C-alpha cells in the first residue's frame, strides 16, 4: 500500500500537466495602409493554449511569417485576467473596424514599448504564477 501511495505522489509531483498552461502574447505588426500608403504599426494581443497553432493562424491571414514580440505562460485563469486587464486599460485605444467591430489590436497612437512595459508590470506585481517565456 505504501508503495502504491508513493507512486501516486511521484506521479502528481512529476506530472504538473503543462497542457493546462495558457499563453498571453504580444505581436507588433506593421502594414501599409491601402488608402494613404502610410506604414502603420499596431500591437496585437491575445491568449491561446497553443502558440504554434496561433502563429500558423496569423501567418495564414497575413501571408507572411510572424514573430511574437512577447510571450508569457501561466494558469488559464490568470492569463485570461491579464488579457481582461489589458482590454480594460487600453479600451479607448482598441482598433475598431468594419461595422464597428472591436479587435484585440491596440491602435498606433500607443507605442509597443508602453504596452509591453504595462504587461511586464502587471505580471510582476499582480500575477505570481505567470512567467515570461
Feature names for model-found ranges:
Residues 2-133:
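Non-catalytic accessory segments flanking enzymatic or RNA/DNA-binding domains
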Amino acid at each position: 500500500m505504501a508503495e502504491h501511495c508513493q507512486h501516486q505522489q511521484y506521479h502528481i509531483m512529476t506530472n504538473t500537466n503543462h497542457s493546462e498552461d495558457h499563453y498571453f502574447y504580444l505581436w507588433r505588426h506593421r502594414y501599409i495602409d491601402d488608402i494613404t500608403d502610410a506604414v502603420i504599426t499596431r500591437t496585437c494581443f491575445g491568449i491561446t493554449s497553443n502558440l504554434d497553432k496561433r502563429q500558423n493562424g496569423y501567418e495564414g491571414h497575413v501571408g507572411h511569417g510572424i514573430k511574437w514580440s512577447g510571450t508569457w505562460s501561466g494558469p488559464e485563469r490568470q492569463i485570461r485576467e491579464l488579457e481582461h486587464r489589458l482590454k480594460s486599460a487600453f479600451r479607448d485605444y482598441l482598433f475598431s473596424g468594419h461595422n464597428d467591430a472591436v479587435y484585440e489590436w491596440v491602435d498606433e497612437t500607443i507605442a509597443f514599448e508602453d504596452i509591453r512595459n504595462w504587461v511586464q508590470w502587471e505580471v510582476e506585481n499582480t500575477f505570481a504564477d505567470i512567467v515570461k517565456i
